[in-house]
Amino acid sequence: MSKNLLIELGLEELPAYVVTPSEKQLGERLATFLTENRLSFEDIQTFSTPRRLAVRVSGLADQQTDLTEDFKGPAKKIALDADGNFSKAAQGFVRGKGLTTDAIEFREVKGEEYVYVTKHEAGKPAKEVLLGVTEVLSAMTFPVSMHWANNSFEYIRPVHTLTVLLNDEALELDFLDIHSGRVSRGHRFLGTETTITSADSYEADLRSQCVIVDAKERQEMIVEQIKTLEVEQGVQVDIDEDLLNEVLNLVEFPTAFMGNFEAKYLDVPEEVLVTSMKNHQRYFVVRDQAGHLMPNFVSVRNGNDQAIENVIKGNEKVLVARLEDGEFFWREDQKLQIADLVAKLTNVTFHEKIGSLAEHMDRTRVIAASLAKEANLSAEEVTAVDRAAQIYKFDLLTGMVGEFDELQGIMGEKYALLAGEDAAVATAIREHYLPDAAGGALPETKVGVVLALADKLDTLLSFFSVGLIPSGSNDPYALRRATQGIVRILDHFGWRIPMDKLVDSLYDLSFDSLTYTNKADVMNFIRARVDKMMGKAAPKDIREAILASSTFVVPEMLAVAEALVKASHTENYKPAVESLSRAFNLAEKADASVQVDPSLFENEQENTLFAAIQGLTLAGSAAQQLEQVFALSPVINDFFDNTMVMAEDQALKNNRVAILSDLVSKAKTIAAFNQLNTK
């Protein structure tokens, strides 16, 4: 007869960003625990609030399934001594399995007999197995952890309660400094300690204590309440998904309300207002039906609507203090001169091992000028790139960015326009930070693209040059994000400059402030980012084949990955790759000084293959180029079928290997085909 299991871990307030992944982790770890312990179940449902993580298992078997396992031991000739008695090796083997030699039988495997024993283990009651469920809680991993009281252990937050119920029976367990029971805590202000009656009554028991344990239900409540406010007030609310996910993990019983602020603050740039509300106060932004910002906000209270007017006033007061700061900085920053701010950047440290921000900008300016030539920018765009590179970090010293660092670049654009800078320069100041997150928006203008690349390239090379190279998951200077940004920009804009040549050209530059070093490490790091981008769809062998190609042009590499993945599902993929792989492997024996001499050809197949290689232009898209190379497969096979490549005559051998080397030199611009797996 199946049962339902409930586990709830009651904790001190969790950071909002930890709640959802921890809820998911708990469910996954418990499912693994039950499976490994042979306890079948029908379904798992997880719950979470800022003060609890919980999971309920439905249809849990009341007993483990019985286990029957066969174990292979030593060969019979080792298991028996000269008198036919079991040797110490055989005795030790069965002893290790908890059995005696009576359990031994011999089975033939590939012509030889071996010792085998079969072990039968009766399933234990679920209640007994579940005593080990604290292993699941102990194995939980978190981005942060802490000690409390005088305990030697640490956890994400102090644990207050542990409830483990099998139907309505409370199991007694010890975890950290807590003994389990059936007591849970209600809402911090609206509830009290309460008893969980059974696994099935969990939601209802806590709902009576003003706690909605189902995160999805809380989210639906918040959205529904916001929609009601929209209808009542005739407005639109920006329900930002990230903010919604954060807010639902800040509350156990949500109540949405609308507050107001003076319309005068709408004269401050919208980005400042939105940042103040969304990022700092966790408020939702309100707009009119035309999409214009309104002097209102929506917030979500952790509680009911009791004394809601006081709550609204308190939230309005806090927001106004933020908006006052924004208005003040907006007004005062406009009195500053860009040239003065740029001059002060010589005193701002980029990194103590690398130098000042001004020196970083100087290097970026030189790199940007080089990139502008490669990108064939117009004279006006080249001028804009140069000007932007001279000033693009000035806003870091403004009061606004000092208070709201999320607005770096955004305020730089606005202040630059107010100061009379060209629009292309101002836009590039904002765009050079892009992309600012995985999958984030990319710069859209050529000037912005060049400045973004130059800034990221110097950042990457500078940190690597002083030995600050990411290792493992440790990347304090966000160099992976910067490099991923470089790769994404190059791919999106189809910039076909070879990455190795680009990096080589940067290492040829000379600066008084820094000498670039560790080029090999830089290239490997960039390759790893390209590999990651390909890894979204391409298997390992395809990625390795492309990374081993003779071309390092990012857009082409990603296009080839897509083309190879599609081709791998076709009938001619395997034979084409196998013939090319054979050519690649033989070409490794080529003498680079030997050129193909057609006068040494002894059969038509040599001539046909050589002519086909000479006519191979590899034009068009990656898929078309791949098709052209694959089309040579019959010609290559015909060549191998009728030609002894490794001939005894050294001249013939060298000439035939040279033919294959010519083929490989062209095909390898696409991929190292001998790295591909056709099994």
From Swiss-Prot:
It is an enzyme of class 6 (ligase). It catalyses: tRNA(Gly) + glycine + ATP = glycyl-tRNA(Gly) + AMP + diphosphate. GO terms for molecular function: ATP binding; glycine-tRNA ligase activity. The keyword Flavoprotein does not apply. SUPFAM superfamilies: HD-domain/PDEase-like (SSF109604). Keywords: Aminoacyl-tRNA synthetase, ATP-binding, Cytoplasm, Ligase, Nucleotide-binding, Protein biosynthesis. It is found in: Cytoplasm. Its EC number is 6.1.1.14. It comes from the Bacteria. Signal peptide: none annotated. GO terms for biological process: glycyl-tRNA aminoacylation. One of its GO terms (cellular component) is cytosol. InterPro entries: Gly-tRNA-synth_bsu, Gly-tRNA-synth_heterodimer. Tetramer of two alpha and two beta subunits. Belongs to the class-II aminoacyl-tRNA synthetase family. This is Glycine--tRNA ligase beta subunit. It comes from Streptococcus pyogenes serotype M12 (strain MGAS9429). The gene is glyS.
